[in-house]
């Protein structure tokens, strides 16, 4: 009888160990880490999910740009433009930092092209200034797109993605207060 109980407990322990090992999350790469991965999802015009050679998924925010949100004018176009740039599927990444949403902010290259620079050049994103050397090239791509009224720069009244998010949060907060007083 004791033998059966011991075997049962060992079996349970083994099961828990397997479950624990399966749920262990790989630590995120440190800034400066470079790796190659396959793009598995385009979330929006500046965020993707990749699958690396070690079998881990990573949520990536493209460094140096901020694309319109999906609900904004040119949001869908920015997402489609990023999808077109990444159609080869394999990218090389260099991690710059981890953002407050736990995404890797990374420089992404596909088919020999800096994806952030290409999004700026096409007018599908705005330059998001970061603490990084050699940012001037990103300013130049954005300025050229503005001059030629490419992509989102064809609009007359442009709301930046960061202003859009800020204003959306204010509207949501305002609506919550309205609902409380109307109840």
Residue map of PLM features:
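Small beta-barrel nucleic-acid-binding modules, primarily SNase/OB-fold domains
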Residues: 2-183
């Amino acid at each position: 009888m004791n033998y059966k109980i011991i075997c049962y407990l060992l079996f349970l322990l083994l099961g828990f160990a397997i479950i624990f090992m399966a749920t262990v999350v790989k630590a995120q790469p440190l800034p400066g880490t470079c790796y190659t991965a396959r793009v598995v999802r385009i979330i929006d015009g500046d965020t993707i999910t990749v699958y690396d050679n070690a079998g881990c998924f990573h949520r990536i925010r493209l460094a140096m740009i901020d694309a319109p949100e999906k609900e904004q004018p040119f949001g869908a176009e920015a997402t489609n433009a990023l999808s077109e740039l990444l159609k080869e599927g394999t990218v090389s990444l260099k991690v710059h930092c981890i953002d407050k949403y736990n995404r890797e902010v990374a420089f992404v290259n596909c088919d020999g092209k800096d994806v952030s620079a290409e999004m700026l050049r096409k007018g599908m994103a705005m330059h998001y200034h970061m603490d990084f050397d050699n940012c001037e090239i990103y300013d130049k791509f954005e300025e050229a797109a503005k001059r030629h009224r490419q992509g989102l720069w064809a609009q007359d009244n442009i709301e930046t993605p960061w202003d859009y998010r800020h204003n959306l949060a204010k509207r949501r907060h305002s609506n919550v207060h309205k609902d409380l007083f109307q109840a």
